[in-house]
Amino acid sequence: PVASPKNMVDQYYGIARNHDEAQYFANVTNLDAAVGKLLKALKSMNLDQNTLVIFTSDNGPETLLRYGPRSGRSFGVADPLRGMKLWTTEAGFRVAGIMHWPARIKPGQVSGEVVSALDFLPTFCDLAGTKNPENLKLDGTSFLPALEGKGMKREKPLLWVYYSALNERRVAMRAGKWKVLARMNFPKTKTINQKNVSQAKGATLSEFQIFDLSQDIDESKNLAETNPSKLKELQNTMEIHYRELVNDSHVWE
């Protein structure tokens, strides 16, 4: 992690179990202080009331000791969610999403809308009063209605295809309250390149699981067998959007 000032690390000795945990706690404190400086700067320039500030993360807590015994600073937890970073279960990508915009957002609200970083570009286009780029097929949806207390209308479900995920079902989809996981019949790999891209794009899905996250946030009750009609519906939806995503994907080298 990013190194923190010594005085911040020192304040956690006696509280933390060891030096590495003190470093982790100091990192969190340092991040909080940095966000505070940003908000204070906006206020000093009289920009705080009409500036949208978004605080979020790119993934869940670091997987324990992923880099071996020397990486002793993996102290984040995501209970009661299942998994951690590098998983396609909820703990892999369900993260904090805090938005501050006093002129437009009533403080203290909690929204149940599902929002992704994929939604940033269409939202910012919406805020700027412009249209999404016509030459781009965007997977996200503007969440401006959610900021105004209205419901979002997401035309496409959110889809994750993670070739090197640590769990076995490396493709995930979120459609409303439903979560779908599926196996990808393609070997785990960290890189998609010209040598394996054809095989990757031809990979099929199997062994689908479905979960009602409104009742089962830790994804412990697979409803595939007890709700076959919903399984078929969600499986078909995932297949369509999975194929669209992999066919439109580029190889970056």
Give the residues covered by each predicted segment.
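Active-site His/acidic residue clusters
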Residues: 1-23, 62-63, 67-71, 250
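C-terminal cap/loop subdomain of S1 sulfatases and analogous C-terminal strand-loop tails that border
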Residues: 61-88, 105-109, 113, 118-209, ...
